[in-house]
Structure formats: C-alpha cells, structure tokens
Amino acid sequence: MPATAPDIARRAFLAALAAPLFAGTEQDVLDLFTTLASALSEGNGLAFLDRVNHSMTDYEKLERNILALVAQNELVAAIDVIEDEGDEQTRAVQLDWLLQIRSREETGNLVRRREIVKCRLERMKKKWKVASLDPISFFAPPT
C-alpha cells in the first residue's frame, strides 16, 4: 500500500526526532575514546580501566598489560575511529590506534605501535564501556 502524505510526514517527524539520538551516540563514542587516549597519555591506567567492563574476556590480562605499560613507560596515544556501527546499546567500532611508548629508563627506546583495533562497546548505566578489545596484545609492555 502506498504511503499517504500524513504517513510520510509522520515518518519524517519520527526520523527527525531520532537523528539527535544517533548524533549523541556517536559523540559519546568519540568522548569515550578521547578519555581512553588521555588516560594512557597521562599515565593513568586506572582511568583507562574504569571505562572497561571488568567482566569482559581477558580483562585480567588487559589490566596487567595496562598497569605495567603506564608504570614502565611514558605514552602518547592517538585514536581515530574508522568504523562505528550499532545502536544505542551496543556498538562495533574499528579504531586506527597509534601508541608511542618511551621507556622511563634513561636509555629507554621509543617504540611506535599502530594497529587496527576492533572494539565492542556496551552501554552500562548510561555510560559506554569497552566490552572487548582485539588484539589485547597491542597493550602489552615492550619486551
């Protein structure tokens, strides 16, 4: 059955109402990754881990890696969102993640890592949390 003018107007109105919600969701996702990058750059592993779901698979490994990484190194992190798909409860995000790692030792080397990191997000109590990161090895301290 063809849509009538009132149906089209109603659909357009509903779409207009929903548009800011999706725009807000995208901004919230960007804010989350800005927070994660800042936490690493400031050497604050606990602030990074606060935005991660503690029940995610391999959380303990990620926690060990992040805490060791920030304790042993000075970091500069930059994250670009390449792909962001999903709804207001879950998102699948691909990130171009750059991590510069300089050892705190006097003769410390500079290591640059750049990788596509796949991330799944879940909204928990009105906040986005990281539900999975792949590869977790990206966050391992240099050997």
Residue ranges with predicted function:
Residues 13, 68-72, 109-112:
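Short, solvent-exposed secondary-structure boundary motifs
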Residues 1-9, 15-21:
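N-terminal secretory signal peptides
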Residues 88-143:
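Exposed beta-sheet edge and beta->alpha loop/turn motif
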Residues 30-34, 45-96:
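Short solvent-exposed beta->alpha transition segments
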Residues 4-6, 69-73, 130:
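Short, surface-exposed loop and linker segments with low hydrophobicity and enrichment for Pro/Ser/Thr
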